[in-house]
Amino acid sequence: MMTINSDRTQGINTPRFARFFRWTPLPLRLIVGYGFMAHGYAKVIHGPEHFFAILHAIGVPAPELMGWATILVELIGGFAVFIGAYVRLFSLPMAAVLLVAIFTVHLPYGFSSIKLQAVTAAGAQFGPPGYEVDVLYLACLASLVLGWSGPLSVEGLLAKSSSKEKMAE
């Protein structure tokens, strides 16, 4: 007869792992923040006019205005999420950018973001990406909005400072 180790049946829900739970937002913040900043930076470095032309081609109204709005949301919102500042405030416009990308660009290509079409001497050849990564970013933003930014964040430091001030009173 096999005995079950009670510690294993509880998994990570034991007190010794509880101290690690507070760190769960950190990788979400870092990848979402960095990802958004990287996309915004790429649009700037490759010439915003190319992005505006794409927006015009897919029928986005006021493509230059919407292009700059997108770039600013990606750069500023990405940085805010990366450092854990005003995450709830920036999550809404960031989610809007993702939803627009899903419905105007990625939806016709299905879910998968990686579509291997061929492997040639030049390397792997991929098709257009689907909406998978956008949905992952939305899930990460939702987790951060519903939870908190974590201890290594501007919001975490402000909360810690505020609680110390209250204790001193």
Which role does the model predict for each range below?
Residues 1-45, 64-72, 76-79, 83-169:
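Extended, low-polarity transmembrane helix blocks
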Residues 45-65:
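Membrane-interface interhelical connector segments
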